[in-house]
Amino acid sequence: MYDFQGALKDIKNKGLYREFRNVNAAQGPYTVIDGRKMLMMSSNNYLGLCDDIRLKRAAIESIRKFGVGAGGSRLTCGNFELHRELEERLAKFKDVESCIVFGSGYAANIGAISGIADKNWVIFCDRLNHASIVDGIRLSGAKLVVYKHCDMEDLESKIVRYHTGKSLIVTDGVFSMDGDVAPVDRIVKLAKKYNLMTMVDDAHATGILGEKGRGTSEYFGLKDAVDISMGTLSKAFGVEGGFVAGKRKLVDFLRHKAKSFIYSTAPPPHNMAAALEALNIIETEPQARKELAEKSVWLRNRLIEKGFNVPKGVTPIIPLMVGDVNTAVEFSMLLYNEGIYIPAIRPPTVPKGTSRLRISIMASHSYEDMEFALKNLVRFGRKLGIIP
């Protein structure tokens, strides 16, 4: 029998053991964790919609009409009108022909990749892509070729070496733990040069990047350039779910081939209703997106000025690099004791030796909130010798 206890002991000895914190209130700039009021500085609730009254009303009205569950998969009895409406709206929002909604972003990635590719494919994958992308490739049986993070020279050399008739380049649009934006324009150029398909995971870009919040394609001014565009409803949208958007024939194919779609109970109607309301807000209230960008730049620049190892960037994900696992955990705990919630991110989520605090900004954070966080980050950063 497998030695679970021994494996857990090894995890603890490496400083990698995780314990759950219990959230006792809605997520906003402040929440309640284990009974304590905390400044939330690590949520993916970028536009502050998780607790928006309009989304809650939409969900409640849907529950009154449709109940709390879908009752079956989309291909049996669980296909509600709200699913169709959201898919049509998302396709229009992403400026593509069609869209398919999954229960989560993870399900969208593994379903799309394993549904499209098989052992005859070669898939080129950025080294820092999300785990769901890597799992989807492994599930498909395709040959996995990893290229250096955002390194187009390395990608091209590997395309020349490994490219076959059926090949795909897949990348995060915004990398979830680093906050940097993939050079999607250059990836598309390489794909056209060598006749490959492209897939972009825009989980952390949808609703955030681009003039209308459509994601990395809009950010780079690309039209009909990315073959497969994935997004989530659980970040800027503040709800739950994932989707894949693209050509009508692609989406129709995935309805018949994506196992995580076929064999899962459909997302509950109230999630779709809340997501539709979130989309209304994203399309009609660009000010929140503008404020998010301004606040993200403000805090990032202040941290750099104070001497922290923080890369430049344009997204609300701000990685404060620490390196050592135990130091990152201690830093996080010192902040927690002061009422600031920023968990330490450790391997295997990030590569060994790159443990960090993943700070993320919400449009609903005030500058006073960020000043309070900054003051304590500097205070404890100096105490731990992270900054002079």
From Swiss-Prot:
Reaction(s) this enzyme catalyzes, per UniProt: 6-carboxyhexanoyl-[ACP] + L-alanine + H(+) = (8S)-8-amino-7-oxononanoate + holo-[ACP] + CO2
One Pfam family matching this protein: Aminotran_1_2
SUPFAM superfamilies: PLP-dependent transferases
Entry keywords, A to Z: Biotin biosynthesis, Pyridoxal phosphate, Transferase
ATP-binding in keyword set: no
Cofactor(s) required for function per UniProt: pyridoxal 5'-phosphate
GO molecular function, one term: pyridoxal phosphate binding
Binding site for substrate: R18, H130, T349
UniProt similarity note: Belongs to the class-II pyridoxal-phosphate-dependent aminotransferase family. BioF subfamily.
Function, in words: Catalyzes the decarboxylative condensation of pimeloyl-[acyl-carrier protein] and L-alanine to produce 8-amino-7-oxononanoate (AON), [acyl-carrier protein], and carbon dioxide.
Subunit composition and interactions: Homodimer.
Name this protein carries in UniProt: Putative 8-amino-7-oxononanoate synthase
